[in-house]
């Protein structure tokens, strides 16, 4: 009986470790304190980007989700923006915000989550 319990415990431990996921989270923020910030100036297409480096590299390339939880814009113009990730790798990714037309964004920020099966 002890051997059976030991074998079950070992198999369970192997199953848990082989199905484990790596998960990292963080935040990003763009505002006029950044040297190349242009989302609050002029009209037309404007883009800002930020490199994010993971605290610990993933074993395989993760899926990265980004969200907006802070947005400060001009109340007199339409609010248009596109948020996306670029160049996702095991070591990090680039978060990009784009706006167009007469939209003025004074600041935008949010969170990201990177998830990878081992």
What does each of the following model-derived ranges do?
Residues 19-80, 85-118:
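Extracellular receptor-binding modules and their adjoining Ser/Thr/Gly/Asp/Asn-rich linkers
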């Amino acid at each position: 009986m002890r051997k059976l319990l030991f074998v079950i415990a070992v198999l369970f431990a192997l199953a848990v470790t082989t199905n484990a996921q790596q998960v990292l989270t963080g935040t990003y923020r763009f505002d006029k304190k950044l040297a190349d910030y242009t989302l609050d100036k002029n009209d037309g297409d404007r883009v800002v980007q930020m490199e994010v480096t993971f605290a610990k590299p993933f074993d395989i390339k993760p899926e990265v989700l980004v969200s907006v939880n802070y947005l400060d814009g001009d109340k007199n113009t339409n609010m248009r923006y596109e948020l996306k990730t670029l160049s996702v790798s095991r070591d990090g990714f680039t978060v990009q915000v784009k706006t167009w037309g007469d939209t003025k964004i004074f600041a935008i920020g949010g969170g990201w989550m990177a998830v990878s099966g081992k």
